[in-house]
Amino acid sequence: MKRRNFIQLSSLATIGMSLPSAGIVNACSSFPEQSLEFKNLTSELLKEWCDGMLKVQINNPSNLEEHGALRCPSCSHIHGRCMDAVYPFLYMADVSGDEKYIEAAKLVMIWAENNVSQENGAWTVIPNPKSWKGITIFGAIALAESLHYHSHILDDKTLKAWTNRLARAGQYIYDTFTIDFTNINYGGTAIYGLDIIGDVLGNGNFKEKSKKMAEEVQAFFTKNDYLLYGECKPEADKLSAKGLHGVDLGYNVEETLNSLVMYALKNDDQALLQIVTKSLNSHLEFMLPDGGWDNSWGNRMYKWTYWGSRTCDGSQPAFAMMAHINPAFGTAAVKNTELLKQCTANGLLHGGPHYISAGIPPCVHHTFTHAKPLAALLDHWKHLPEINKTTALPRVTANGIKHFKDLDVLLFSRGDWRGTVSAYDAEYHYKKDYRQATGGSLGILYHNKVGLLCAASMAVYNMVEPYNQQPQPGKDIALTPRIETFKEDQWYTNLYDLTANLEAIDTKEVINLASVVKLKNESRKMVSGTASEFHLTYSCAKEGLTIKVSTQQDILEPTAFVLPIASPEKEKVEFVNEHEIKISKPGGVVTIKANVPLKLKEYSGTRTFNMVPGLEALPIELFFETHIKELVLIVSVV
């Protein structure tokens, strides 16, 4: 069988002509010599990851519970989805001719069949037949792509066995998946999954269901911003008190939108292409200049890694394959891949920008999932549009305020400053609180010269998915800037205020964002016996960001504003005086000044570290004093 390409030029050309855009390029011919720099980056990173996975693959035929699996440097268990690596391994085997990659692909499949394979055709997330089976769709896509593009390098016995196994998995997905049977990423991903499985197996029923689901998913985009929604429990269409849907940027850009784009291009689905183009443009507003994804507000940000989401696949296919519509999509694909490279060490992708500097071991899950989309890009390379970094990202050129009505989230930009303020009240779970940035909090603060300065974490780090997250090392200190007080060992903060609203004014010189917030505990009970209501304002000018916190109520308990500044331990910190701190970064010096003394929260070591989004930080705090009812904090960069 010769290597084939599902997504043909005709689809790319059609969508390029039907969606007017100043950035459309000619999609009617191949680009074998274009995008060479990005191709080299992609190829080299994929090889680095595959070789890294080879180093942790277990070869122990005497113990079938581990033989063939990928040992995780950070987790005590084996990840059931490690068989997803079959696709990148087989790709590497095909292009390199090296038998070691074929053997690696066979080994991960052997482990899966011995440990997570079920009679009904499913695979489970761990070696427990009662555990979650929805992940079958991801393994099935990996196996289908392996067989479609690279089956010619397999021996007949393996080819037959894997084809039969794919048929069983496909039948399970066909029988059990609907568009909204759980979080939208599963039904959405099954659209492409059933389609490609149907092609590999010649099963028309699978393709018909895929087409039906592709029509159904079009109802799951928000009214104003075309953000894909449905990442919430117990129903995908659950609304918050403000009437907002559950949206998660990480799952959307790294998983579901990939599936929708690849299906729509492959089948020339013009209706779906129109919608996903609008959706990609909206999601792209949240990419930061360095290629990081701003998921500070996302419903499932408990898996936010700055470059994406812990167990998703990567955003490269959706954005790269649509770069003929908007060249900035291509920029996004390149910049994010560069960030993935920066977060890679010893052949494995680490879960955030400061994992390596903090000495936090990586979870192998990041690598075997993010290797798949790189293989997919390379398998389609001759049919991709031109991909480069020449077109600026929206957040690079932004100047002013952008309000996402469907999230109640504000993006602000002035000079070199970029920031996100959130009053988003949607919740992932209907019983438990996995708090993302809200309550008028600053989810992101970024400066073009020095990079990321602030990034939200969970209010309290929680192992929402214990098999897909790493334990928090050391003391858990939230990274989200906030107002806080403690009373009778209860923590009260605006991070739990889901009723806050935002106001914004741009004078062309200064952007002013304001919110009235209340201090509440995790049970949403407001603090009593001390000030509970505060005015929180952010004023952004070219010269810097000024944060003011004030109240008209009596402050009877120690109350502070906390500003954690992202900073790896190698950066020099100077306490100029009790009101001023300087942090030296490669691109400049960050200065924090306040009208009251600045202190650091207590923690061990030289920095605190938070798993979300994988950052080291200096948790600066400043307390209200008896005669002062307004805190004034200024952040500047020179």
UniProtKB/Swiss-Prot annotation:
Subcellular location(s) per record: Periplasm
GO molecular function (one): heparin-sulfate lyase activity
SUPFAM superfamilies: Six-hairpin glycosidases
Superkingdom assignment: Bacteria
BP GO terms, sorted: carbohydrate metabolic process
GO cellular component: periplasmic space
Residues making up the signal peptide according to the UniProt record: 1-27
pH dependence: Optimum pH is 8.
Residues spanning the membrane: none
Catalytic activity: Endolytic cleavage of (1->4)-beta-galactosaminic bonds between N-acetylgalactosamine and either D-glucuronic acid or L-iduronic acid to produce a mixture of Delta(4)-unsaturated oligosaccharides of different sizes that are ultimately degraded to Delta(4)-unsaturated tetra- and disaccharides; Elimination of sulfate, appears to act on linkages between N-acetyl-D-glucosamine and uronate. Product is an unsaturated sugar
Top EC class of this enzyme: lyase
Chief localisation class: periplasm
EC number(s) on file: 4.2.2.-, 4.2.2.20, 4.2.2.8
Biophysicochemical property: temperature dependence: Optimum temperature is 40 degrees Celsius.
Keywords associated with the record: Lyase, Periplasm, Signal
Induction cue: By ulvan and rhamnose.
Known function: Broad-specificity lyase involved in ulvan degradation. Ulvan is the main polysaccharide component of the Ulvales (green seaweed) cell wall. It is composed of disaccharide building blocks comprising 3-sulfated rhamnose (Rha3S) linked to D-glucuronic acid (GlcA), L-iduronic acid (IduA), or D-xylose (Xyl). Ulvan lyase catalyzes the endolytic cleavage of the glycosidic bond between Rha3S and the uronic acids GlcA or IduA, producing oligosaccharides that have unsaturated 4-deoxy-L-threo-hex-4-enopyranosiduronic acid (deltaUA) at the non-reducing end.
Family from the record: Belongs to the polysaccharide lyase 37 family.
Protein name: Broad-specificity ulvan lyase
